[in-house]
Swiss-Prot record:
Keyword Amino-acid biosynthesis appears in the UniProt entry: yes
Gene: proA
Family: Belongs to the gamma-glutamyl phosphate reductase family.
Pathway: Amino-acid biosynthesis; L-proline biosynthesis; L-glutamate 5-semialdehyde from L-glutamate: step 2/2
Location, primary (coarse class): cytoplasm
CDD domains listed in its UniProt record: ALDH_F18-19_ProA-GPR
Family annotation (InterPro entries): Ald_DH/histidinol_DH, Ald_DH_C, Ald_DH_N, Aldehyde_DH_dom, G-glutamylP_reductase_CS, Glu-5-SA_DH, GPR_dom
Organism: Burkholderia orbicola (strain MC0-3)
Known catalytic reactions: L-glutamate 5-semialdehyde + phosphate + NADP(+) = L-glutamyl 5-phosphate + NADPH + H(+)
Sample GO molecular function, one term: glutamate-5-semialdehyde dehydrogenase activity
Entry protein name: Gamma-glutamyl phosphate reductase
Root EC class: oxidoreductase
Cited PROSITE patterns: PROA
Superkingdom: Bacteria
Length: 423
């Protein structure tokens, strides 16, 4: 296969399909989503058979159990796919909305209309459910998409692509609106991220090594985040009960997500009250604690252990594991300075009863999501009321934070006049 020619052809067809998608009615888009959902229900066994072959190859390669679990399409996973498709169909269609319409002294009206981005390239790893999630959001937002999944899920993704194509055709929409790259050759990724004439944006969903490669090689703009080094700062004016709840949930609700707390900052004025209780809670949940000297002194005095001395590297680390770095700081100034220096601009929280300090934290912490008296785990499209998300961005341009339907659109100015000319 000539990868360069193959990817160019996918891009050309996607660009052509994107024009039809931009003018597609809400009813047609919803009909396509429903048709795909019904096709998955109808062909569930065929999907599981294709997936079983992928899973068998993954096991033969010696891939770990966690990877195989992400790859597997269980009955529950298929049900979640179907529910997700119908949920996206139920969301309000943002395309064509005109907002901020204002009369100007010249007599014209000026507003902004929400429009699709065009062609979106999605690059992801082992989870075949992303094929459906990404296709659904791109379809509903009027975009065409090129999906490049992990090589380990090649048969699963091909089977899903067939059903997506059927759903699009049933609704009178172009099948090329959703195309799945049918090769495991890594050169396909290299071509996709440089096709500026056909692809408007890339959304990567994967590990740090993938994102770093794309940052270095992509010519197409990206919606991405590299790390989730999330902090909770407990102020000396915090409510202890709230602090315990927030810090427990932010770390132990799930360890392997990008919105999990990785560093806990505690004001020196509350450390002696909070850390012994929190340390015992983490110890009981088998969380490894990597602590600075001040935190060690308080925790050791309370009989909490074992403790590991934190190094400079710990403040830079996204563990994605039951490991937590803890630092005692002098107060709000030191906490904000630490977060802005070591953080990844993803999600950070303060626990405090002081309104002025809370507002200052919201203003000065340079992150996509900033929270007061709430767990960092809330940084999620569903929890934010977006209905669904394609990912989280910690960049500052275009989309920031959880990216839902609106994040896959842009705005263009529209002008309504009555024959006016500029004076």
């Amino acid at each position: 296969m000539d990868i360069d020619q193959y990817m160019t052809d996918l891009g050309r067809r996607a660009r052509h399909a994107s024009r039809a998608m931009a003018r597609a009615s809400t009813a047609a888009k919803n009909a396509a989503l429903d048709a795909v959902a019904r096709a998955i229900e109808r062909d569930a066994q065929a999907l599981k058979d294709a997936n079983a072959r992928d899973v068998a190859r993954a096991r033969e390669k010696g891939l770990d159990a966690a990877f195989v679990d992400r790859l597997t399409l269980s009955d529950k996973a298929l049900k979640t796919m179907v529910e997700g498709l119908r949920q996206v169909a139920s969301l309000a269609d943002p395309i064509g909305e005109i907002g901020n319409l204002k009369f100007r002294p010249s007599g014209i009206q000026v507003g902004q209309m929400r429009v699709p981005l065009g062609v979106i390239g999605i690059i992801y790893e082992s989870r075949p459910n992303v094929t459906i999630d990404a296709a659904a959001l791109c379809l509903k937002s009027g975009n065409a998409t090129i999906l490049r999944g992990g090589s380990e899920a090649l048969e699963s993704n091909a089977a899903l692509a067939k059903l997506i194509g059927e759903g699009l055709e049933a609704a009178g929409l172009p099948q090329d609106a959703v195309q799945v790259v049918a090769t495991a050759d890594r050169a396909a990724v290299g071509k996709l991220i440089t096709m500026t004439e056909y692809v408007d944006v890339i959304v990567p969903r994967g590990g740090k090594s993938l994102i770093e490669r794309l940052i270095n090689e992509a010519r197409v703009p990206m919606i991405k985040h590299l790390d989730g080094i999330c902090h909770v700062y407990v102020d000396d004016r915090a409510d202890l009960a709230k602090a315990l709840t927030v810090c427990d949930n932010a770390k132990t609700h799930r360890y392997g997500t990008c919105n999990t707390m990785e560093t806990l900052l505690v004001a020196s004025g509350i450390a002696a009250k909070l850390l012994p209780r929190l340390g015992k809670l983490y110890r009981d949940k088998q969380v490894e604690l990597r602590v600075d000297a001040a935190a060690r002194a308080v925790l050791a005095d309370a009989g909490v252990g074992p403790l590991v001395d934190a190094t400079e590297e710990d403040w830079h680390t996204e563990y994605l594991a039951p490991v937590l770095a803890i630092k005692v700081v002098d107060g709000l100034d030191a906490a904000i300075e630490h977060i802005n220096h070591y953080g990844s601009h993803h999600t950070d929280a303060i626990v405090t009863e002081d309104h002025d300090r809370a507002m200052r934290f919201l203003r000065e912490v340079d992150s996509a999501s900033v929270m007061v008296n709430a767990s960092t785990r809330f940084a999620d499209g569903f929890e934010f009321g977006l209905g669904a998300e394609i990912g989280i961005s910690n960049d500052k341009l275009h989309a920031r934070g959880p990216v839902g339907l609106e994040g896959l659109t842009s705005l263009k100015y529209v002008v309504l006049g009555h024959g006016e000319g500029r004076q």
